[in-house]
C-alpha cells in the first residue's frame, strides 16, 4: 500500500519521510527510476531575463513554450517545474596594493551585511511513464523475466526520455545568455575523493530538507537514503528540522485562477525578501480526455447557470482550438511553500505572498488540509499528494511556468578574472558587472575579447561616481597581471581628479597659458619616437595653414635627430629650434620653419617666450608610465583651444600608445564626444575601438549628452564596438536617440526614462540581454567626497596637497578633516 497523507496532525507529530519518497535508484548519469517504474530527469534553467524584455518578445516565448509542450505531449509524459527562491551570499575577493582602494572595497562589501541577497533558481523535471502493460511486466511479474530483458525495457525507456530531453534542450537553450547555454541537465559527478555524487539527488534532497548538500549515489534504495531532516506537519504550518537549523513553512494554492495567464503573471513573487519554493506539475491528457474535460466544463456552466453566454462561447472556442492542436490539456497543480525561521515571520511572509497572488487575479488560500501532502507533492512523481488538481491548457501552463528570471552577469572566467564588482538589484539577485562580454560558463581568462564600455547618464544621475568607483575597483586587475596594468583617464571638469590622486596616480590639469609638464623630446630616442617627433613638429609649423615643403621636412628631421643624440636634460623644443637652419634667401627666412616654430618655444631665439611655449616645451616631462600606472589628464581648457588641441592630443595619444604593450590597459574618456571632436583623438578612437582588444585593452566612454556622441565623427565605432552599455536614469531621454542611435529596446527605453534620478539605479546591457543594477553608497560620505569630483572638494584637495605633499596616506586624512570642519562651519553659519 502506498503512503497515505494524514490530515490535521499536530505540529510535533513526526512523519517518516521514506513512504513519501517515490524514487528507487539512479539508473544513469541523468536518470532516476521510481518505485512505480517512472523514469525521471531534471534540468536547471537559467531563465529568460524578463525584467527588461519587450512584452511582445515575452509573448513569443510563451507561444514557443506552448509549441514545445505540444510536441512532447503524451499521456506517458508529465512535467514538474520548480522556482526556488533562497538566500545567498557572495563577496568578490580582491587584492589592492593601494590603501584607498582596499579600504573602499572592504567598506563596500561590508555594506552588504544585512542585505537580502537572494537567488532564483528554475528547474524542470520530465517524467516518462512506460505504458501500463510494460509496467506490469517489468515490476509486478519481473521475477518471470530475465535480467537482460529488464535491462532492455529500461534501455528503451531511457532512450525515449533522451528523445524528449533533446527536444527540451533544443527549445530552452536560449533561456539564458547569448551563448545558448540556458539549460543544463542535472547529472552525476565525482567529488575530490572520487565518490560518485548526483546533482539530481541533491535537488530532490533540498526539496525535502531545505538545505543544499552533497549527496552520493547510494547502493541502497533512494527512499531509504534521501531526506536529511525531520518533518512535523500541523494544521497550517510545517516544521522542518535538520542538524543545522529549524525552519517553518506554510503552503498556498489556488482555489480559482485568473482570467488570463499572460507570461510572468507570477513574477511579483520574485522580488520578495523571503525564501519559497513554487511547485507546478502538468500531466498531459490525451486529446480525447482533454475534449471530454472541456465538454464537462461547458455542461457544468450550462446546467448550473453559473456561466454567462460569453463563458460558454469561450468553452466552445477552446474545444475547437484543442481540436486544431493549438494547445493540449493537462492535469495541473500549483503550490507555493513559504519559509521562515519562526512562526510569526512565516505567517507574515505567507500573507504577503497571498496579497501578490490575489492582486494578479488568483483566489489564493492557505493550505489547511493535507498540509504535509502539499509538501511531499514538491517531489516529482508524487501524483497522489497534489492539492487541488485542475484541468489546464498547455498555453496557460506556459504562462504560469514561463521560466522567467533575472540576468546576473558573469562572476568568474572573465578575460581578466573575476567580475569587476558586485552590484545590488531590485530583486536582491547578485549582479556581476564586467567590462568584457564573454559567454556563459566558458573560462575566457586571458582571452582577448571585446571590453569597450559606454556610459550614458545626465548630470546628477551618478555618472562620475560610477566611473570613479569602477576605476577604483579596476585596480584589482593589477594584481597577478604578468605585464602590469595601466589606466589613462581623459577627464572633463576634473571629475576624476580626487580618485586618480587617491589611488596613487598622477593628475595633470591642462590649463591654457600654464605649463603642461609635457616635453616630448625626453622620450627614448627610438626610431618610432623620432618619426613621431618629426610629425609633431610638422604639425606645429603648419597650424596656420602654412605648407611644409620637402626642404622643411629635411630641416626638421635633421634638427630633431641632432637633439635626440643629446643628454635627456638638454632635449626640448627650444633646443630643436636652435638646430633648425634658416633659409638661404629672404623669402625663406621670412617664412622659415624656425620662425613658425618659435612661437611654440620657451626661448624663441631672441630670449623671449613664444605664445605657446607652455604646451610642449617644459624642462621636465611629467609623463612616465613606469613610475605611475594611473594617469589623469583634464581637458576642460585645452579642448576648446583650437590652436593647441591637436598637438597636445597627439602627444598624449602617442604616449598612451607606447603603454599599450600587452599589459592590461584601460583608457577612460569622460564626455567622450568632446575628446573625439579633435582629429587626432577621432582617428585614435576609431581605430582603437576595433583593435585594442587584441592588445589586452579596452576603452570606457561616458557622456551626459547622447546627441553629441551620436553626432561625433566616430559615432559608429563608439556605438557599435562596445561590449557593455550602461544607461543611468534620464527622465528627459529622447526616444530616437536611445532606440535608433543606441539600439535599446522599447522596454529598456521606458526603464531608463522611468528610473528615479536619486535611485542610483542603472541599466547594464551586454549583447541582447540587460539587467537593472544599483550602486548603493549610503554612509560613504568620506569616499564620495573623493569619487564625486566636486569643484569645492577639488579646490580643498589642491590646498592640502600643496601643504603636505601628494602621498595619499598623508593628504587623505587631512583632506577629510578639513572637509568635515568646513561642513560644520557652514552649518553653524547657517544657523
From Swiss-Prot:
Binding of ATP, residues: 457-464
Listed NCBIfam families: VirB4_CagE
ATP-binding keyword on record: yes
Keyword set includes ATP-binding: yes
Keyword terms: ATP-binding, Nucleotide-binding, Virulence
InterPro entries, A to Z: CagE_TrbE_VirB, CagE_TrbE_VirB_cntrl_dom, P-loop_NTPase, P-loop_TraG, T4SS_component
SUPFAM superfamilies: P-loop containing nucleoside triphosphate hydrolases
Family stated for the protein in its record: Belongs to the TrbE/VirB4 family.
Organism superkingdom: Bacteria
Entries under Gene3D superfamilies matching the protein: P-loop containing nucleotide triphosphate hydrolases
Protein name in UniProt: Type IV secretion system protein virB4
Organism of derivation: Brucella melitensis biotype 1 (strain ATCC 23456 / CCUG 17765 / NCTC 10094 / 16M)
GO MF annotation terms: ATP binding
Pfam family, one: P-loop_TraG
Amino acid at each position: 500500500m502506498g503512503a497515505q497523507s494524514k490530515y490535521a496532525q499536530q505540529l510535533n507529530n513526526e512523519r517518516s519521510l521514506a513512504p513519501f519518497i517515490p524514487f528507487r535508484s539512479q539508473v544513469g548519469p541523468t536518470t532516476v527510476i521510481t518505485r512505480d517504474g517512472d523514469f525521471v530527469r531534471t534540468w536547471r534553467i537559467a531563465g529568460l531575463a524578463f525584467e527588461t524584455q519587450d512584452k511582445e518578445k515575452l509573448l513569443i516565448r510563451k507561444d514557443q513554450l506552448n509549441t514545445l509542450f505540444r510536441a512532447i505531449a503524451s499521456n506517458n509524459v508529465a512535467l514538474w517545474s520548480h522556482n526556488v527562491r533562497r538566500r545567498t551570499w557572495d563577496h568578490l575577493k580582491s587584492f589592492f596594493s593601494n590603501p584607498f582602494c582596499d579600504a573602499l572595497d572592504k567598506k563596500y562589501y561590508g555594506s552588504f551585511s544585512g542585505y537580502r541577497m537572494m537567488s532564483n533558481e528554475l528547474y524542470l523535471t520530465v517524467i516518462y511513464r512506460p505504458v501500463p502493460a510494460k509496467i506490469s511486466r517489468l515490476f509486478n511479474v519481473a521475477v518471470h523475466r530475465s535480467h537482460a530483458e529488464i535491462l532492455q525495457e529500461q534501455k528503451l525507456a531511457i532512450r525515449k526520455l533522451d528523445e524528449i530531453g533533446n527536444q527540451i534542450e533544443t527549445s530552452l537553450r536560449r533561456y539564458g545568455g547569448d551563448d545558448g547555454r540556458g539549460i543544463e541537465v542535472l547529472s552525476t559527478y565525482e567529488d575530490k575523493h572520487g565518490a560518485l555524487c548526483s546533482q539530481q539527488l541533491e535537488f530532490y534532497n533540498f526539496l525535502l530538507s531545505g538545505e543544499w548538500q552533497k549527496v552520493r549515489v547510494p547502493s541502497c534504495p533512494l527512499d531509504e537514503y534521501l531526506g536529511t531532516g525531520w518533518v512535523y506537519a500541523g494544521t497550517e504550518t510545517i516544521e522542518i528540522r535538520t542538524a543545522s537549523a529549524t525552519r517553518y513553512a506554510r503552503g498556498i494554492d489556488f482555489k480559482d485562477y485568473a482570467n488570463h495567464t499572460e507570461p510572468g503573471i507570477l513574477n511579483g513573487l520574485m522580488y520578495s525578501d523571503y525564501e519559497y519554493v513554487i511547485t507546478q506539475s502538468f500531466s498531459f491528457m490525451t486529446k480525447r480526455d482533454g475534449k471530454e474535460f472541456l465538454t464537462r466544463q461547458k455542461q457544468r456552466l450550462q446546467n448550473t447557470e453559473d456561466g454567462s453566454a460569453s463563458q460558454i462561447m469561450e468553452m466552445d472556442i477552446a474545444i475547437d482550438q484543442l481540436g486544431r492542436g493549438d494547445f493540449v490539456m493537462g492535469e495541473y497543480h500549483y503550490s507555493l511553500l513559504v519559509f521562515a525561521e519562526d512562526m510569526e515571520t512565516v505567517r507574515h511572509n505567507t500573507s504577503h505572498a497571498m496579497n501578490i497572488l490575489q492582486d494578479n487575479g488568483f483566489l489564493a488560500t492557505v493550505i489547511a488540509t493535507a498540509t504535509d501532502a502539499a509538501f511531499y507533492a514538491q517531489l516529482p512523481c508524487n501524483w497522489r499528494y497534489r492539492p487541488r488538481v485542475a484541468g489546464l491548457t498547455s498555453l496557460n501552463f506556459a504562462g504560469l511556468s514561463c521560466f522567467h528570471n533575472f540576468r546576473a552577469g558573469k562572476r568568474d572566467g572573465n578575460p581578466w578574472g573575476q567580475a569587476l564588482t558586485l552590484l545590488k538589484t531590485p530583486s536582491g539577485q547578485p549582479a556581476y558587472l564586467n567590462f568584457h562580454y564573454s559567454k556563459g560558463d566558458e573560462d575566457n581568462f586571458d582571452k582577448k575579447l571585446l571590453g569597450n564600455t559606454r556610459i550614458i547618464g545626465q548630470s546628477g544621475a551618478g555618472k562620475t561616481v560610477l566611473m570613479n568607483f569602477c576605476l577604483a575597483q579596476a585596480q584589482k586587475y593589477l594584481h597577478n597581471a604578468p605585464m602590469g596594468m595601466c589606466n589613462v583617464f581623459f577627464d572633463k571638469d576634473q571629475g576624476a581628479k580626487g580618485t586618480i590622486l587617491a589611488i596613487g596616480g598622477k593628475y595633470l590639469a591642462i590649463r591654457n597659458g600654464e605649463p603642461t609638464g609635457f616635453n616630448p623630446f625626453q622620450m627614448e630616442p627610438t626610431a618610432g619616437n623620432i618619426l613621431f617627433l618629426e610629425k609633431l613638429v610638422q604639425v606645429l609649423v603648419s597650424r596656420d595653414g602654412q605648407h611644409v615643403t620637402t626642404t622643411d621636412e629635411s630641416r626638421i628631421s635633421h634638427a630633431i635627430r641632432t637633439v635626440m643624440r643629446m643628454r635627456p636634460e638638454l632635449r626640448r623644443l627650444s633646443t630643436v629650434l636652435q638646430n633648425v637652419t634658416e633659409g638661404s634667401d629672404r623669402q625663406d627666412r621670412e617664412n622659415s620653419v624656425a620662425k613658425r616654430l618659435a612661437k611654440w618655444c620657451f626661448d624663441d631665439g631672441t630670449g623671449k617666450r613664444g605664445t605657446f611655449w607652455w604646451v610642449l616645451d617644459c624642462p621636465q616631462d611629467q609623463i612616465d608610465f613606469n613610475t605611475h600606472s594611473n594617469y589623469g589628464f583634464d581637458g576642460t581648457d585645452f579642448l576648446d583651444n583650437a590652436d593647441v588641441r591637436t598637438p597636445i592630443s597627439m602627444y598624449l595619444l602617442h604616449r598612451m600608445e607606447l603603454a599599450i604593450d600587452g599589459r592590461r590597459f584601460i583608457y577612460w574618456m569622460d564626455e567622450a564626444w568632446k575628446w573625439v571632436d579633435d582629429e587626432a583623438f577621432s582617428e585614435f578612437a576609431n581605430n582603437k575601438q576595433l583593435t585594442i582588444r587584441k592588445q589586452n585593452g579596452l576603452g570606457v566612454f561616458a557622456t551626459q549628452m547622447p546627441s553629441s556622441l551620436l553626432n561625433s565623427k566616430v559615432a559608429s565605432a563608439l556605438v557599435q564596438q562596445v561590449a557593455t552599455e550602461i544607461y543611468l536614469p534620464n527622465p528627459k531621454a529622447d526616444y530616437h536617440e536611445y532606440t535608433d542611435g543606441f539600439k535599446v529596446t522599447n522596454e529598456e527605453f521606458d526603464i531608463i526614462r522611468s528610473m528615479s534620478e536619486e535611485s542610483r539605479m542603472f541599466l547594464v546591457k551586454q549583447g541582447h540581454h540587460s539587467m537593472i543594477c544599483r550602486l548603493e553608497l549610503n554612509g560613504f560620505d568620506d569616499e564620495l567626497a573623493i569619487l564625486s569630483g566636486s569643484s569645492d572638494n577639488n579646490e580643498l584637495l589642491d590646498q592640502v596637497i600643496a601643504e603636505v605633499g601628494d602621498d595619499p596616506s598623508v593628504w587623505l586624512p587631512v583632506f577629510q578633516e578639513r572637509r568635515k570642519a568646513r561642513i560644520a562651519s557652514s552649518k553653524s553659519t547657517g544657523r
